[in-house]
């Protein structure tokens, strides 16, 4: 039994067999997928994943894609989905299925800065993040390299700031520097300047067990220096689900979240009362699930999926015939 494999909880973390998958899919209208580690690894689709999603589309299931990656626009993600064989809308509707932290951060600022004339944000992040902000009318400054100017703190603090910056947005930024951190702190000395983080992922996993520092490390650096707490947009924050819900009109009882990370994907699903499926093609393992099940911490128990699969391709038999 899968329950024994995952830790003995009689109601949670059941292996999703073809028979169980048929029953589950009959109760579900919408499936929300994480991307990296679930649908693909880098530029390679998980074997069988494109066929599974095409079969779900053919069955009339509504699909959404929720990613903490802020380095691509939703249009760029839609192009990748099509390029790797997952299908999806084209033309003016391309990207409408994708809810990334770049896009959702832009929605958040549009809400919070409503009524502010010509809103402006200092962005520690990617051109894609800046592009999504610009698309909703928020001017972005700060993207790209920024090295220290001068010989010491007096020189660094003398560097001119952009006027009227109303938000500091921290995403994945390979050009993160002490100069940028210093500027962010200076902007945040204004009490009406918002601090927004795209996500709190501590690591970005790579192939062969390697990893690099994630966006959460950068957000924490700004929080500590500014002595401010960021508003977090991405999983497991409810805000990113609210973005999906507002555009899709989702019924949580008929929605499933599919992901490879317990602390983001599965926790989001649990928080938002969704059914959850863990796929073992990415970050989290059954040993991680077992540890959470055996913990006395109720927060960790929220990071236990309803079901698990070795790969989302395991859903395919339930969709055939």
From Swiss-Prot:
GO terms for molecular function: ADP phosphatase activity; glycerol-1-phosphatase activity; glycerol-3-phosphatase activity; magnesium ion binding; phosphoglycolate phosphatase activity; protein tyrosine phosphatase activity. Induction: Up-regulated in white adipose tissue and down-regulated in brown adipose tissue upon fasting. Its cofactor is Mg(2+). Gene3D superfamilies: HAD superfamily/HAD-like. Inhibited by orthovanadate, beryllium trifluoride, Ca(2+) and EDTA. Ubiquitously expressed with higher expression in testis, heart, skeletal muscle and islet tissue (at protein level). Homodimer. This is Glycerol-3-phosphate phosphatase. The gene is Pgp.
